[in-house]
Amino acid sequence: MDAIQEVKRIIPEVQKYVNQRMEEFERLGREGWTHFDFRPFLDIDYDAGLFSELSFCILTANSSATLGIKIQAHLGEEGFLNKTKEELEEVFRKFGHRYAGQRAERIVEAREKFPKVKSLIEKEKNSKVIRELLADPKSPYKIKGFGYKEASHFLRNIGFKDLAIIDRHISRFLMEKGLLRQVKSITPKVYLEAEKALESLAKELGLSLGELDLYIFYIKTKKVLK
């Protein structure tokens, strides 16, 4: 089955959950907070703010969305903003995160950059410009642990719809469908190639990249998460 047919086949099954998630993302970007409800895929719902979403994207890199969601639900905005590095590390270990110390350190470091990042998001409307600034090591906005994928993930989750999140599920789907050459790792060059392939697919399906990501994630995992 080609990519277009496969996505079209599952749209009726999960469209209401994808639409709900996109609304939750847009509210987070617009109002600075949102209420996420992951049922029926995970029996979890909670309020989230911008910094806790940034922290979620730091946590999920080379980990899983499910684990990130559980930790985010447990800590809330206040926990991510106020707990010490040691306290965060203890929570991450308790939940079984493989990189507990490293992620705690990165989240504490990100607090210093956050006011600057927040003002960048408010004034700059071009998502690709913001992504570059969040991922570029020479940028004053650089978040440690963010490359294109993590920056795109954060921006999609706060309402920017035109960026692709090339994680292992998405890259595998593209390679299986012959839309991306077989690669062992996702370099920035490969990332942009994959994003281009997804842009064409999204256009044919009449979807945004943000929506398409959720549909492909569902094809691969049977869950609509984030």
Swiss-Prot record:
A single MF term (Gene Ontology): hydrolase activity, hydrolyzing N-glycosyl compounds
SMART domains given in the database record: ENDO3c
Sorted UniProt keywords: DNA damage, DNA repair, Glycosidase, Hydrolase, Lyase, Multifunctional enzyme
Catalytic activity: 2'-deoxyribonucleotide-(2'-deoxyribose 5'-phosphate)-2'-deoxyribonucleotide-DNA = a 3'-end 2'-deoxyribonucleotide-(2,3-dehydro-2,3-deoxyribose 5'-phosphate)-DNA + a 5'-end 5'-phospho-2'-deoxyribonucleoside-DNA + H(+)
Annotated site residue numbers, Important for guanine/8-oxoguanine distinction: K226
InterPro entries in UniProt: DNA_glyclase/AP_lyase_Ogg (IPR012092), DNA_glycosylase (IPR011257), HhH-GPD_domain (IPR003265), HhH_base_excis_C (IPR023170)
EC number(s) given by UniProt: 3.2.2.-, 4.2.99.18
Active site: K149, D167
One example of a Gene Ontology biological process annotation: base-excision repair
Assigned protein family: Belongs to the type-2 OGG1 family.
Protein task: Catalyzes the excision of an oxidatively damaged form of guanine (7,8-dihydro-8-oxoguanine = 8-oxoG) from DNA. Also cleaves the DNA backbone at apurinic/apyrimidinic sites (AP sites).
NCBIfam families: PRK01229.1
Annotated protein name in UniProt: 8-oxoguanine DNA glycosylase/AP lyase
Organism: Aquifex aeolicus (strain VF5)
